[in-house]
Amino acid sequence: MKAVIFIMDGLGDRPNKDGNTPLKEAKTPIMDKMAKDGICGLMNAVDVGVRPGSDTAHLAILGYDPYTTYTGRGPFEACGVGVTVKPGDIAFRCNFSSVDENFIVTDRRAGRIENTSELEKELDGLKIDDVEIIFKESGGYRAALVLRGPGLSDRISDADPKKEGKRVKEIHPLDDSKEAKKTAEIVNRLLKIAYEKLDKHPVNEERRKQNLPVANMIVPRGVGQVPEIMPFTEKTGLKGACIAGTGLIKGIAKMVGLDVIDVEGCDGTPNSDLMAKACAIVETLKNYDFILVNVKGADEAGHDGNYELKKEIIERIDEMLDYITKNISKDEVYFVISGDHSTPIEEMDHSADPLPIVIWGKSVRVDDVEKFDEFSTHKGGLNWIKGTNIMPILMDLMSIAKKYGA
């Protein structure tokens, strides 16, 4: 038996005034059929009442305790864009953002700029004192920053003010160590250099002419050091792969030893080629025991507060599942469908609302659930689980779980 965990990023939502969510209102005949033929429930990726990041959620879903393995988003983001992070490196995730001359943020995502490769070149390879700057864009407005040099620390604050209309935060050390003080100073200097180099860059001058938000600042957050994680194959005995469009998820996969399968046209945006991803899933199953799949678009729509787009993306994902289920055997593959977190339209950010989950495959205890949405799957046989329960359940179904006790 093989297994797929299929994650619709930001899937869950809260009811609008009509009692609907994008998932409830979307036409999803395949998801509904899989719910009817599978075992369903609700799932909190990290824990009840905890608003998870995509990083901590995916770690949990892969069977890792995020409270002991997670050091910050930065190392995963950097790893995902191809940086070979070394011991002692300090890594951050970054947004390209729009700021005014006083560093007041006017657009946290720089108008969702699509291509920042030319801007990347302005910062990658810089040196500030004895610290090397490694800077890589990771798709759209996202990027990864790595500081490499002696005497650095991840005990520093973030620069992200979280909301527009506020100033980019000055970085502060979180302890009295000289390493933390040095690192904070280096990052603060880098932010000033970034503004000077990016504000008048031709890419941004052209965006001004088109009345588009400029990408004239980088905002680092999610600082961390490289964690020590047991490889997925060693932990489960499964040869695993990952199909995802975003650098963060690719980085998590690489960090735990999953092979990352790149699919042309799949970049983690709402415009990703989902059918190309569906074809890749079917093909990859021929050579792997396990695949982690992440489809990002619904999360982007949730962050933008775009109800109709989120519903449309969910319907497009259902078309993916139509192709996949027609080209795999229920007797050979266990297929898990869920999300990593909710991104409600009203919040435009992650929430702790639980997610619907279904496991479809041979010999599951089919329950009475007939629709896959936030309001129906709680009646299912899985009841209410955490993300860290998924892999043990799958391994038991696949008959590879070890017995606990005599």
UniProtKB/Swiss-Prot annotation:
Its EC number is 5.4.2.12. The keyword Isomerase applies. The keyword Ligase does not apply. Keywords: Glycolysis, Isomerase. GO terms for molecular function: metal ion binding; phosphoglycerate mutase activity. It comes from the Archaea. Disulfide bonds: none annotated. It catalyses: (2R)-2-phosphoglycerate = (2R)-3-phosphoglycerate. Pathway: Carbohydrate degradation; glycolysis; pyruvate from D-glyceraldehyde 3-phosphate: step 3/5. Gene3D superfamilies: Alkaline Phosphatase, subunit A. GO terms for biological process: glycolytic process. Signal peptide: none annotated. Catalyzes the interconversion of 2-phosphoglycerate and 3-phosphoglycerate. Belongs to the BPG-independent phosphoglycerate mutase family. A-PGAM subfamily. This is 2,3-bisphosphoglycerate-independent phosphoglycerate mutase. The gene is apgM.
